[in-house]
Amino acid sequence: MKNIVFCGLSSRAFSMFIKPLMERFSTHYEITGLLDADPKRFAVCKKKFPELAHVPEFSEDAFDEMMRVSKPDIVIVAGRDDTHVAYIVKSLQWNTDVITEKPMVTTVQDANRVLEAEAKSEGKVTVAFNYRYSPFHRKIKEMILDGKIGRVTSVDLNWYIDTYHGASYFKRWNRSRQFSGGLSVHKSTHHFDLVNWWLGQNPEEVFAYGALNYYGPDSEWNPLPEEDGRFCGTCRVKEKCHYYSRWHPRSSKASIKDDHLEAGDQSSLYTAYRPDACIFDEEIDIEDTYVAAVKYDGGALLSYSIIFSAPYEGYRLTINGTKGRIESNEFHEPSRIPFAFPEQTIEYYPLFESKQTIQVVKNEGGHGGGDPLLLEDLFLGKDPLRRYDILAGAEAGAYSIAVGEGMWRSVAEKKPIGMKELFQMQNV
């Protein structure tokens, strides 16, 4: 039996880690400590999981005490993004393994701190990049490894975050770069890690454009531009807000599924934080639209775009190689898509042969059954039958962050950003 402690009692910590640990891995692990900056989160956690009523609680400045009392074998870091680095580094100083939610940290400077701490530690860092585990994404990796498309030359990845999911980031702490690193870090690092992993190459340089088009005070959808600092729960013009109306349909029977934004007043779950801030606030300092080009050290090129206010959620993917091409389109969450859409497949186009359509079987669980497989690898060890590495470590986390930070810096500085330059610049 191994001991696990949590730094950060977020909704993600509950759904992705605590619930599965209690239901599927309780014969292997025991949760022996809970740490959070907000005392109310302990009550929320223990109400949701009564079995944890006896587990000691620790404030954010009591990390060392928790390590002495709870004696963890693994520290799971799942709080606000900017808090990750301190707990990861401290855990490594205690020679303890770390599982961290993505993004690993929010800046390349902090990524350097993690890499340096890991090099001196007996512990290691694992980043919970669950997109790698999607059955479609694993199949694409296998096709590339099998040489189906030869040497990869370019990737086109267009990602669409819909008005439900996209708006949620601008209601919450994610809308501040100091907390999230911006959405090029908080969200796009998922996508960059996926491409980095598919290619088996490291990014060298990124050039990007970006803008705030849908949210913030200048949005054409803002129903009351002259008033700042509103909250959905008390807003006097919320019935005129298209984003609010999509999440709060007039029919009480209507149900929209989203794991980032919950209907109803959530303020009682926190001490001094409201996750229903106005998406048109002046304080928003991040972008909601990006277009970027990334060059890799193995010769591959990535063309990437993402918007955070699309009519539907999903992606369009093309991977070109010297011997063929892979295409796949995903439409995410049927309850949020207002039209009929096809099942996802993988289209394989050999360079001089006929097209092949590949069906992929989805399993139970999030991300097409990918989440349960990630959890098995995290808590039961790597699958001995899998012929390729899939768990992400600190270096993978660092490269994904470097592309994300390089992207927003390129937007701000209007120039290409080299990864080597970025790591050296931030190595202070």
UniProtKB/Swiss-Prot annotation:
Gene3D superfamilies xref list: Dihydrodipicolinate Reductase, domain 2 (3.30.360.10), NAD(P)-binding Rossmann-like Domain (3.40.50.720)
GO MF annotation terms: nucleotide binding; oxidoreductase activity
SUPFAM superfamilies xref list: Glyceraldehyde-3-phosphate dehydrogenase-like, C-terminal domain, NAD(P)-binding Rossmann-fold domains
Signal peptide boundaries: 1-23
Any Pfam family: GFO_IDH_MocA
EC number: 1.-.-.-
InterPro entries assigned: Gfo/Idh/MocA-like_OxRdtase_C, Gfo/Idh/MocA-like_OxRdtase_N, Gfo/Idh/MocA_Oxidoreductases, NAD(P)-bd_dom_sf
Function: May play a role in the degradation of type I rhamnogalacturonan derived from plant cell walls.
Stated name of the protein: Putative oxidoreductase YteT
The gene coding this protein: yteT
